[in-house]
Amino acid sequence: MSSIQQKTDVILIGAGVMSATLGALLKELAPELEIKVFEKLAKAGEESSNEWNNAGTGHAALCELNYTSEKADGSIDISKAIKINEHFQLSRQFWAYLVKNNLIQNPQDFIMPIPHMSMVQGEKNVSFLKKRFEALANNPLFQGMEYSDDPEKLKEWIPLIMEGRATNEPIAATKIDSGTDVNFGALTRMLFDYLKTKDVAINYKHAVEDIKRTSDGMWKLKVYNMGTGNIEEHIAKFVFIGGGGGSLHLLQKTGIPESKHIGGFPVSGLFMVCKNQEVVEQHHAKVYGKAKVGAPPMSVPHLDTRYIDNKKSLLFGPFAGFSPKFLKTGSNLDLITSVKPNNVITMLAAGVKEMALTKYLIEQVMLSHEKRMEELREFIPNAKSEDWGIVVAGQRVQVIKDTPAGKGTLQFGTEVVSAADGSVAALLGASPGASTAVQVMLEVLEKCFPQRMAEWEPKIKEMIPSYGVSLMQNQELLHEIQRSTDEALGLSEKELAYS
């Protein structure tokens, strides 16, 4: 049975952090817009945004070594780190605005202060880390970073990691106290609670099955109502496809030229979680290592203090897995049905070029619990097998596209694909993902509502004072933003409470 629904201004597909952020921005900028949300699951933030399905790192390039590469001349390129840090500052400002205006409450339920650290072993890696520290230390965005290769100092910083460790190999770490742990699931749920108060119609258990352009340039969505069994038709002027791994299939259904020659490759993630609370309490940091030679960027190992359900947890990973599903709740046919005549060459080219990734995934899938424990013991030498279990994290669909570098190039970032007229946009990709949600959704606004940006700019700057400004070039504004966001999000006093 099918029913025709009324037209609406905006439809958001997927109730994850991206749709939540875009909805919140739009309701603050243009409260008159009528917005509908369709989510096939029963609650918000249950796929990639869920707290158990991602690392929960507030990605600001404070500790992630893959954001600072070593150039041929041995110098360190920090341009990507600067960009990611500035993007995270935008998120902090928007969250602080929402808290200060009482639009969301209890920020401690979604963001906690935690030192961010990088740790490496071996002479070559120690040399790299020292050069990285020297390249970042005087940059105002990375103020307060410390470096040490003294084992006694490292025992103060990371006692659990140093206990039982042989000291015959060089080891070094950097530490910066302004890092954060972010519960993106809790944040997503808060944002949707706020959107409900703004008369946004949030429809759970509604699966979008098709999306087609109408003769008058609008978009008609075929939506399956899982509660009634009915097929509904909804029409909107603007559609945002924020369905995580499910976005690629829906983007392909739009038929827009920009959707061609794009593929996706799913990578699943596993984390080890500590079951011994005594061990959990011995560690207080997010410690990122260096990916092994030949391993993809998403394989960077890290040992993380997390705050989930107001409880301190300890996770290690990620370990990669393979499933043809594009979502944890997806279908085993997702990968094969994403291959179309316009992207088959792109996908095949990637298959040939990415043999190292294929080999890595096969090796990861074959790992036993004890083999994973061996990798964990590179971080915690005294780790006991019985103290650690496995949690299956979310699916990440890495974008494959044709670039100037050649056909079938695997992308490791987050990417907005939009129609030339701005009437539809989709978010594809993975890391740094949710941390940059505000920057990415501002990009959606710029691409899809260019005629309204001049009108909206004063309000955007009220919410996000550094919008359009380089904080690295404006230290006074940077320090004011850091102070005000720390205060609004309660980060300063919480750090004192947990240190």
UniProtKB/Swiss-Prot annotation:
It comes from the Bacteria. The lineage of its organism: Bacteria, Bacillati, Bacillota, Bacilli, Bacillales. Its cofactor is FAD. Signal peptide: none annotated. It catalyses: (S)-malate + a quinone = a quinol + oxaloacetate. Belongs to the MQO family. The keyword Flavoprotein applies. One of its GO terms (biological process) is tricarboxylic acid cycle. It comes from Brevibacillus brevis (strain 47 / JCM 6285 / NBRC 100599). The keyword Cytoplasm does not apply. Pathway: Carbohydrate metabolism; tricarboxylic acid cycle; oxaloacetate from (S)-malate (quinone route): step 1/1. This is Probable malate:quinone oxidoreductase. GO terms for molecular function: 2-hydroxyglutarate dehydrogenase activity; L-malate dehydrogenase (quinone) activity. Its EC number is 1.1.5.4. It is an enzyme of class 1 (oxidoreductase).
